[in-house]
């Protein structure tokens, strides 16, 4: 059973939440997000609080309640991330480690030199903002936590940290365990 869904989600001032059928829409100062949800879940809005509960109208047998409670925890977390996203936003920072490895923005493209024979070009999605404050640092930010994390993971995938030398793209604060090389 999900116990996190027992807590209500606090809706801050300036954030508007609407439920239209099986779609939750959250509008705030940074933008607007919407999320579809299954009919197993019931969303109730009371003033500045939102509750996510299992929808017992869809329960056919007793074992369905376990599945419904599982979904309430998942959707509680998704809806909470939406409220945080439209108020504060999300940010992931990446650092590039390696001699000659660097990144730069060229219009709507992120161009990275990562030791390959050619520079790697990556199209930046419109719902995510990418900044390059220095050639060795990339900041990915946006209001949708899933999109920010996915774009950061896609950038990191171009050159994951090498387990022997540590060179590559890593998240800021990520600890890369280095293996010992061959002994002669």
Curated annotation (Swiss-Prot):
Gene3D superfamilies linked: Ribosomal protein L6, alpha-beta domain
Gene Ontology terms for molecular function: rRNA binding; structural constituent of ribosome
Domain of life: Bacteria
Disulfide bonds: none
Keywords (A to Z) from UniProt: Ribonucleoprotein, Ribosomal protein, RNA-binding, rRNA-binding
Xref: Pfam families: Ribosomal_L6
GO cellular component annotations of the record: cytosolic large ribosomal subunit
One example of a Gene Ontology biological process annotation: cytoplasmic translation
Annotated InterPro entries: Ribosomal_uL6-like, Ribosomal_uL6-like_a/b-dom_sf, Ribosomal_uL6_a/b-dom, Ribosomal_uL6_bac-type
Function: This protein binds to the 23S rRNA, and is important in its secondary structure. It is located near the subunit interface in the base of the L7/L12 stalk, and near the tRNA binding site of the peptidyltransferase center.
PANTHER family for this protein: 60S/50S RIBOSOMAL PROTEIN L6/L9, LARGE RIBOSOMAL SUBUNIT PROTEIN UL6M
Assembly, per entry: Part of the 50S ribosomal subunit.
Family: Belongs to the universal ribosomal protein uL6 family.
NCBIfam families for this protein: L6_bact
Protein name: Large ribosomal subunit protein uL6
Provenance organism: Thermosipho africanus (strain TCF52B)
Lineage of the organism: Bacteria, Thermotogati, Thermotogota, Thermotogae, Thermotogales
């Amino acid at each position: 059973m999900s116990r996190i869904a027992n807590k209500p989600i606090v809706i801050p001032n300036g954030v508007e939440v609407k439920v239209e059928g099986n779609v939750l829409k959250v509008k705030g100062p940074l933008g607007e997000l919407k999320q579809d949800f299954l009919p197993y879940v019931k969303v109730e809005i009371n003033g500045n609080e939102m509750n996510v509960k299992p929808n017992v109208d869809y329960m056919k047998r007793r074992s369905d309640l376990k599945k419904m409670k599982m979904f309430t925890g998942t959707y509680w977390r998704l809806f909470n991330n939406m409220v945080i996203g439209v108020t504060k936003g999300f940010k992931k920072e990446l650092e590039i480690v390696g001699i000659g490895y660097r990144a730069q923005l060229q219009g709507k493209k992120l161009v990275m030199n990562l030791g390959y024979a050619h520079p790697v070009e990556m199209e930046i999605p419109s719902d995510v903002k990418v900044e390059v404050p220095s050639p060795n640092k990339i900041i990915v930010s946006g209001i949708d936590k899933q999109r920010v994390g996915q774009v950061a993971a896609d950038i990191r995938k171009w050159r994951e940290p090498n387990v022997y030398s540590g060179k590559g793209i890593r998240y800021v604060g990520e600890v890369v365990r280095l293996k010992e090389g061959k002994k002669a």
